[in-house]
Amino acid sequence: MSFCNVCPRSCKVDRKQSIHEKGRAGYCRSGMLPIVSRAALHHWEEPCISGTRGAGTVFFAGCNLSCVYCQNYEISELMQGEEISVERLRQIYFELIAQGAHNIDLVTPTHFTHAIFQSLREPLPVPVVYNCGGYESIHTVAFLRKKIQCWLPDLKYSLREPAARYSDAPDYFEKATAAIEQMYRQTGPYEIGSDGILKKGVLIRHLILPGNLENTKGVLRYVAETFAPGQVLFSLMRQYVPWGRASEFPEINRRLTEEEYNEAKAYMEELGIVDGYTQAADSSDAVYIPAFNGAGVREPSKEEF
């Protein structure tokens, strides 16, 4: 990609000349080859993703957002990970499947779309989940039409001010909702198999931020007004933990209160959003943040013991 426009930032940089510094290699600071920080079974996604055996998660380093509270800060901002070939990426998929993964869960994949497309040149025997921050180009979503069965986008913001302040993306809502609607056009209504695993469809996630209930209510209204019951799944998350640079923003440098979550949940129920998930209070714990230690990235014969 010598003129990158894979995401809404449309940096138009030459990704072949990437240097891991913002301003020199596009917003995501990524080259052509994927940088992977962890590849392992993950048991803490929504039940229709993790199931009983775990999702086959592949965590990519870098990001096209700069969320100040990112729980994956070590890899999204600090770029911890190992650059691998497209062929090695495909091998990782099959290693995870051999371990029992219900699916292949690509976490923060947007900036490596072209490498991922190549790695999925032939279909996999399990669904592929595109687990993204929501700040997507509809053209990139369309490009992946025949490769992705399950879309797992965040819908972080309905308001411009928090989108700009916390993620440097004032146009987030417009871009994310357009992308989500394109995802739905491609998959149609969600389908869950007899094993409880999502086979195709869209699962929209929203993480409630402390002190930002109006932002959350805007997201909930959008979902209720745009999709009918049975069309998409929705996950109302309370797992916020102050992380990354959250300490620089006093208003979000705390956990969510029980009252805040209950108000958001009640509003969701009032709007008639019934397909999906809520979270227990104990989900707000750093223990659920994976160790980004390179597990599963190197070829088995090259792993260090």
Give short role names for the model-derived ranges.
Residues K22-R24, C28-C150, L159-E161:
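Conserved Radical SAM active-site core
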Residues G56, I104, V128-Y130, W151-P153, ...:
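Hydrophobic faces of well-ordered beta-strands that scaffold small-molecule active sites
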Residues F60, T108-T110, Y130-G134, L155, ...:
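A cross-domain feature marking catalytic cores of carbohydrate-active enzymes
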Residues Q91, E95, H114-Q118, E122, ...:
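Alpha-helical scaffolding segments of alpha/beta enzyme cores, especially the outer helices
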Residues R145-R160, V232-Y240:
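Non-cysteine beta-strand/loop elements that form the S-adenosyl-L-methionine
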